[in-house]
């Protein structure tokens, strides 16, 4: 599970609370914004151990702080387990800002050394107003969108595809869609996206 702007404030550690409630014991959290009594930031929850964790600062100049949280895990697909790279991105509000942030991420050490067939899941609040970031920046380097372009904001009447899930390497997408339950519309001003993935077992 990947969360953006997850709070840790007023003595409530939501990352740990969600970890316990969902039975996902492995947690990585980086507070993009720190306050006197807490803050909020990117979070990855997993049933499997997380390693090789990197945080990349994507802040442009004096704009609001943004970042990427990346971790490596071993996921079971049937009788086999494979390494999967998980990347949680939160991009800025301005179009030029988002482009610069993606270029910085794609040129960064945690990412640029990965083989194209290495399974990668990249997801988050991309603030992608028009759904163009994938075709412009991610698909040229081998990513594909998990499922159709989906409107996720605002949650109660979605009109913008701000959020997205992209995959690269030996991964196949079975489905990717937002849950339609009322609680999903109440939990956040963005609808969540849920993807079901398989591994192409003929990979290295």
Put a short name on every predicted segment:
Residues 1-9:
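Active-site neighborhood of divalent metal-dependent phosphoester/pyrophosphate hydrolases
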Residues 8-10, 16-21, 25-204:
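Active-site regions of metal-assisted phosphoester/phosphodiester hydrolases
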